[in-house]
A protein has these predicted regions:
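Positively charged, Gly/Ser-enriched RNA/tRNA-binding surfaces
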Residues: 3-4, 23-25, 34-47, 55-108, ...
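Glycine-rich loop at the start of a catalytic domain that most often binds anionic cofactors/ligands
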Residues: 4-20
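Short, conserved secondary-structure transition motifs
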Residues: 115-129, 144-152
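Short internal beta-strands
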Residues: 113-117, 301-304
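Internal, well-ordered alpha-helical segments in soluble enzyme and binding-protein domains
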Residues: 94, 118-121, 140-143, 180, ...
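A charged helix-plus-loop insertion that forms the helical arch/lid used to bind
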Residues: 133-144, 155-159
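Short glycine/threonine-rich loop-to-helix capping motif typified by GTGT followed
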Residues: 10, 123-133, 225-231, 288
């Protein structure tokens, strides 16, 4: 459980969202993402790896969360990261990379959008709200991260006393006052980039002639280890559930800068940034496009017991 980033157990057990069990005196957990294990690897092999260290990985991860259309408790995740550089060109390149991946999958530029924001935006927001409690900040971040899936009215309940879903499960809220919630709502309506890191990334996008992005302060990303620019990829076409009903699908990928995560596993100053895509989630959405087809190929093994039949 010591390699799951945000979910480092600082109480009696890891936080919700992780499949965990106790083995004598310590907690063991299924891999929640591919980023935190990378940070642990970098910390243990810091002197041996080149800087910046670039890597990509495919791997299975598990989420102890309520499943839904395109949302699974076990799924395949693609991850790409830059480790050991503060240069924001790395962040911009990862946004372009995720764009190229989607277009290789058959999507057109009109089918998706890369949204960018910065964790510095929420840092200023918490200062304005005069909120310092890490637990309360964590609840607020998770609530804001659900806006694209639940909508503002339902996310607002999570900012206040809490929310009961259709199954009757109740999620405790952040207990914010009405005026605090209003401050957040107004801040999310601001569409002008107001942080230096976002402005610099936009300049790099322009030099790449990359236009498939927009600034969106509602992009939060629920994980606490993000420290700077954050990005998210949303689809622009309708996605339906198994009953054929249109749904708010949310993002199919995203990421951001996590300059302090490696230091959780060693006394190192090692900036990093990365992106990830939920492949099962992406395929669920792609299968609903009328013009999308998966080219399925598979090996065929033929056992021959008579050498004289080889030519046949």
């Amino acid at each position: 459980s010591d390699s799951i980033g945000k979910f480092l157990p600082d109480k009696d057990r890891p936080d919700e969202g992780v499949f965990s069990f106790k083995d004598e005196t310590k907690w063991l957990s299924l891999r929640y993402d591919l980023t935190a294990p990378l940070a642990r690897y970098v910390a243990k092999n810091y002197l041996e790896i080149p800087k910046p260290f670039k890597r990509y990985q495919l791997g299975t991860v598990w989420r102890n969360e309520k499943p839904g259309p395109g949302r699974y408790r076990e799924f395949l995740q693609f991850d790409a990261d830059y480790v050991g550089t503060k240069n924001l060109q790395a962040d911009a390149e990862l946004c372009v990379l995720i764009s190229e991946i989607l277009e290789k999958c058959g999507l057109n530029k009109i089918d998706y959008i890369v949204k960018i924001s910065s964790r510095k935006f929420t840092d200023k927001l918490f200062e304005q709200l005069k909120i310092k409690s890490k637990d309360q900040i964590s609840i607020i971040l998770r609530a804001l991260d659900k806006i694209d899936r639940l909508g503002w009215s339902e996310a607002q309940k999570l900012l206040e006393k809490g929310r009961e879903d259709k199954s009757g499960d109740f999620t405790k809220g952040a207990n914010l006052k009405k005026d605090q919630v209003k401050i957040i709502e107004n801040a999310l309506k601001n569409k002008n980039p107001n942080s230096e890191d976002v402005l610099e990334i936009i300049k790099i996008f322009e030099s790449y002639n990359f236009k498939n992005y927009k600034f969106d302060p509602s992009v939060i990303r629920g994980l606490e280890y993000y420290t700077g620019p954050i990005f998210e990829v949303n689809l622009n076409f309708d996605v339906k559930n198994l009953k054929g009903q249109p749904i708010q699908f949310g993002s199919i990928g995203g990421g951001g800068r996590y300059d302090n995560l490696v230091s959780n596993f060693g006394n190192l100053d090692c900036p990093a940034t990365g992106i990830s895509i939920g492949l099962d989630r992406l395929v669920f959405a792609l299968m609903q496009k009328k013009d999308f087809r998966i080219k399925a190929t598979r090996p065929v093994v033929i056992c021959i017991f008579d050498k004289s039949k080889m030519k046949e």
